[in-house]
C-alpha cells in the first residue's frame, strides 16, 4: 500500500514536472521567435532606408556667403537678384 502511494505520487510529480518543463520550453521558443522576427523587420527597414538614400540622394545645401551690409561697395540689387536666381533654380 505504501509502495503504491509512492509509485503514484512519483508518477504525478513526473507528469507535473513534464508539463511545467514543456511550458517553459514553449515560452522560450516563442520569445526566440519574436526576437528573430523583430531582427528580420529591422534588417528590412535598414535595407529600405539604404535603398531610399540611394534613390533619393540628399540635396546639396546652398553655400551661405557672409553678407556685410555696412560695406560701402556692397551692391544690394545684385545680392537680391542673385538670391532670386538661386530660389528659381
UniProtKB/Swiss-Prot annotation:
What does the record give as the function of this protein? Mitochondrial membrane ATP synthase (F(1)F(0) ATP synthase or Complex V) produces ATP from ADP in the presence of a proton gradient across the membrane which is generated by electron transport complexes of the respiratory chain. F-type ATP synthases consist of two structural domains, F(1) - containing the extramembraneous catalytic core, and F(0) - containing the membrane proton channel, linked together by a central stalk and a peripheral stalk.
List keywords of the entry alphabetically. Acetylation, ATP synthesis, CF(0), Hydrogen ion transport, Ion transport, Membrane, Mitochondrion, Mitochondrion inner membrane, Transmembrane, Transmembrane helix, Transport
**What is its membrane topology?**
Single-pass membrane protein
Give the Pfam families listed for this entry: ATP-synt_E
Sites bearing N-acetylserine, chain numbering: 1
Q: Which superkingdom, per the lineage?
A: Eukaryota
**Protein name in UniProt:** ATP synthase subunit e, mitochondrial
Query: Might you name a Gene Ontology BP term for this protein?
Result: proton motive force-driven ATP synthesis
Cellular component, GO annotation: mitochondrial inner membrane; proton-transporting ATP synthase complex
